[in-house]
UniProtKB/Swiss-Prot annotation:
Residues 4-391 form the SAM-dependent MTase C5-type domain. S-adenosyl-L-methionine binds at residues 13-15, 34, 57-58, 76, 376. It comes from Rattus norvegicus (Rat). The keyword Transcription does not apply. This is tRNA (cytosine(38)-C(5))-methyltransferase. It is found in: Cytoplasm.
Length: 391
């Protein structure tokens, strides 16, 4: 097969390019496009020979796109208009303009690409922009399938639920195509229960999710006390859920993704321990889970990602239950016994599936690295979807 000519839009730090390499699909990236100077420096550091265009997508004419003669598009449009914690401006958000421009010129290309892969946040699937994307796919004659997938389904101890669309220009449906449904598992990964799909009802997309079973004791007929706070801000249900995750042997332990070197600079400062102790999501090297790492990791605490307890022999419950009656200095001393630290940028890159040789230019600051990784994607998930798409 002739190598595919790939156009990489919103190329960032090259997650799509790394996924393409990992998939072993014969391909050549004819152009990568991004406006971020910092991201482009990282991309160039890892792919020095790729044609990188540091310009807006709207600044590229239809004729210029035609000259690139690509037959695959990989893209991860800005997610901020669709995030659950954002304003959800959707089409009215100016950051959506470049993607709307792509949807406008796609049908007007001299030659349509054969393959398309798109990644975005959960929330995109219920946006008006997604509706326009689907209309465009159908008008152009693409067969497509949508997914909501997390790296944990590949045995990676990290939650990062993301929306994906893969599309192929052909008349026959994809062999795994489920019209009007969003698959919650990879094709050919076993039987998918109907409740694990998203379904369309009365023209509206609705995602069905299974309620977590928090009653681990089969002798109990009800979850009494599941909502009461035990320690930190965690209920018995929260603790049971985390224990279930940590006992899932299909998922790797975090220790396989950690660095061996000196990580003292990543220890949480005393003021963060004192102020945010009850908000921290704490994991150990033996844990089989971690929260999604966002671009605010390292700068903000709540909801930006897990922190690592490196003093594994210290019982976290005992520490937290002793805190309420202590003065601030003693609280800090107690919490310091856990030796909590941030995951390093390299460790987050490992969890995101970037290869060992992936790196940053020396001048890229730690804060910038966290931000870039938080805006990136999981390489392994995209790689598997590319393999499925090009089979």
């Amino acid at each position: 097969m002739e190598p595919l000519r790939v156009l990489e839009l919103y190329s960032g730090i090259g997650g799509m390019h790394h996924a393409l390499r990992e998939s072993r699909v014969p391909a050549h990236v004819v152009a990568a496009i991004d406006v971020s100077t910092v991201a482009n420096e990282v991309y160039k550091h890892n792919f020095p020979h790729t044609h990188l265009l540091a310009k807006t997508i709207e600044g590229i004419s239809l004729e210029e796109f035609d000259k690139l003669s690509f037959n695959m598009i990989l893209m991860s449009p800005p997610c901020q208009p669709f995030t659950r914690i954002g304003l959800q401006g959707d089409m009215s958000d100016r950051r959506t303009n470049s993607f709307l421009y792509i949807l406008d010129i796609l049908p007007r290309l001299q030659k349509l690409p054969k393959y398309i892969l798109l990644e975005n946040v959960k929330g995109f699937e219920v946006s008006s922009t997604r509706g326009l994307l689907i209309q465009t796919m159908e008008a152009c004659g693409f067969q497509y399938q949508e997914f909501l997938l997390s790296p944990s389904s590949l045995g990676i101890p990290n939650s990062r639920l993301r929306y994906f669309l893969i599309a192929k220009l052909q008349s026959e449906p994809l062999c795994f195509q489920a019209p009007g449904q969003i698959l919650m598992e990879f094709p050919n990964s076993g039987t998918v229960q109907p409740q694990e799909y998203a379904v369309v009802e009365e023209g509206k997309l609705r995602v069905r999710t299974r309620e977590p079973d928090v009653c681990l004791d089969s002798s109990s007929t009800q979850c009494s006390g599941q909502d009461s706070i035990l320690f930190k801000h965690e209920t018995a249900a929260d603790i049971d859920r985390k224990r279930q995750q940590d006992s899932d042997l299909s998922v790797q332990m975090l220790k396989g993704f950690l660095e061996d070197g000196d990580t003292a600079q990543y220890l949480l400062p005393a003021k963060s321990l004192l102020r945010y102790a009850l908000l921290l999501d704490i994991v150990k090297p033996t844990s089989r889970r971690s929260m999604c790492f966002t671009k605010g990791y390292g700068s903000y605490i709540e909801g930006t990602g897990s922190v690592l307890q490196t003093a594994e022999d210290v019982q976290i419950e005992n520490i937290y239950k002793s805190l309420p009656d202590l003065p601030p200095e003693e609280k800090i001393a107690k919490l310091s016994m856990l030796k909590l630290r941030y995951f390093t940028p390299k460790e987050i890159a490992n969890l995101l599936g970037f290869p060992p040789e992936f790196g940053f230019p020396e001048k890229t600051t730690v804060k910038q690295r966290y931000r870039l990784l938080g805006n990136s994607l999981n390489v392994h998930v995209v790689s598997k979807l590319l393999t499925v798409l090009c089979e």
